[in-house]
Amino acid sequence: CSCYPDWMAIPGSGCYKYVDTPKTFEEAESTCRHFSPGPYGFGHLASVHSTEEYEALASMVPGATDSWNPQVFIGLRLIDGVSPAWTDGSYYDYQNWCGNDPNAHPDGYGAFSGGSYCNGQWVDVHTFTNDQFPFKCKLPCIE
């Protein structure tokens, strides 16, 4: 798997970039979509499909600053609070939720929680709060 400079390759999964500039979920997805490796497809917020992929992405999250932070958006939407869907349209076949999450907000987004409480597991974030977090983008490999 070949990637652009400053992107991390995970063989069999894709290319990943940690973006430290906090944005809302929708702004982050839009930013990721602007990354495009030409004919190979568009970027999206990162989807996660295996323990190996999760561990590689978790290693990109800075160390804990408190019980919950840093929180980092991934490309997971929660429809009706419980139905997860990846922004890239891929199959939801892996999960790593913290505690009782997702806990039935009307709608929500998924984020890594790098703080000491969840230690990198996922938390759900209310859509109505317009929280801004750093985020992870994913691109197809450049072949």
Swiss-Prot record:
Gene Ontology MF, one: carbohydrate binding
Pfam families, sorted: Lectin_C
Domain C-type lectin, residue spans: 11-138
SUPFAM superfamilies: C-type lectin-like
Top-level division of the source organism's lineage: Eukaryota
InterPro entries given in the database record: C-type_lectin-like, C-type_lectin-like/link_sf, C-type_lectin/snaclec_domain, CTDL_fold
Disulfide bridge partners, by residue number: none
Keywords: Calcium, Lectin
Function: May be calcium-dependent and galactose-specific.
Name of this chain's protein: Lectin 1
Lineage of the organism: Eukaryota, Metazoa, Echinodermata, Eleutherozoa, Echinozoa
